[in-house]
Amino acid sequence: MASKLLRAVILGPPGSGKGTVCERIAQNFGLQHLSSGHLLRENLKTGTEVGDVAKQYLEKGLLVPDHVITRLMMSELETRSAQHWLLDGFPRTLVQAEALDGICDVDLVISLNIPFETLKDRLSRRWIHPSSGRVYNLDFNPPQVQGIDDITGEPLVQQEDDKPEAVAARLRRYKDAAKPVIELYKSRGVLHQFSGTETNRIWPYVYTLFSNKITPIQSKEAY
């Protein structure tokens, strides 16, 4: 078993179950799960320099550009250089992937593919706790009390961009941006693609992939 630090990435459109898979990987293998969305929210909330720059774009209804997200992630990764980590939501574009290349070699990339109809149904059942980013799904991860966050008791909201037309546009945007990233990692022999909708079905394969790279801290039965 190699003793080098593991550098892993998970790719997938919003609603593909990335967050759930990442949580299981982190729990079973002790990796740091670094979500670009979560880090962005934290920086917006605490008013860091990069958070303030991102806010200027978001207030205009614009996507946060590559260079801002890259700067956010690079500064976080600098502080995590002695840890195994798993990136979620980064790199989303070829420019971001090339920036990541500048600081490390990625060992393992998982790409989750999901049919549009499934994604549309799943996102329409999705409710979010805005301040923490916690996500609930009414079918397979419902809150204990409908419309209320389990931990804080604050109300949950549905996002505008979880509506079908918005989901279709997001999926197209994701695919257009992710295609060259997927091709890059495929050409390096580090990409593993999974199609389907059920985390439980793909989990044994994901567990095996990571087990070949890093010693588990608990068995795969620990869901």
UniProtKB/Swiss-Prot annotation:
Entry coiled-coil feature ranges: none
| Signal peptide positions on this chain | none
Name a single GO cellular component: mitochondrial matrix
Keyword Metal-binding attached: no
Which Gene Ontology terms describe the biological processes this protein takes part in? ADP biosynthetic process; AMP metabolic process; ATP metabolic process; cellular response to hypoxia; GTP metabolic process; regulation of oxidative phosphorylation; ribonucleoside diphosphate biosynthetic process
Which of the residues bear the PTM N6-succinyllysine? K60, K179, K186
Q: Which residues carry this modification: N6-acetyllysine?
A: K175, K179, K186
Alphabetized GO MF terms: adenylate kinase activity; ATP binding; CMP kinase activity; dCMP kinase activity; deoxyadenylate kinase activity; GTP binding; nucleoside diphosphate kinase activity; nucleoside triphosphate adenylate kinase activity
* Positions of region (LID): 125-162
UniProtKB keywords: Acetylation, ATP-binding, GTP-binding, Kinase, Mitochondrion, Nucleotide-binding, Transferase
Q: Where is this region: NMP?
A: 35-64
Q: What's written under domain?
A: Consists of three domains, a large central CORE domain and two small peripheral domains, NMPbind and LID, which undergo movements during catalysis. The LID domain closes over the site of phosphoryl transfer upon GTP/ATP binding. Assembling and dissambling the active center during each catalytic cycle provides an effective means to prevent GTP/ATP hydrolysis.
What is the protein's quaternary organization? Monomer. Interacts with SLC25A5/ANT2.
Protein name listed in UniProt: Adenylate kinase 4, mitochondrial
Organism of origin is Mus musculus (Mouse)
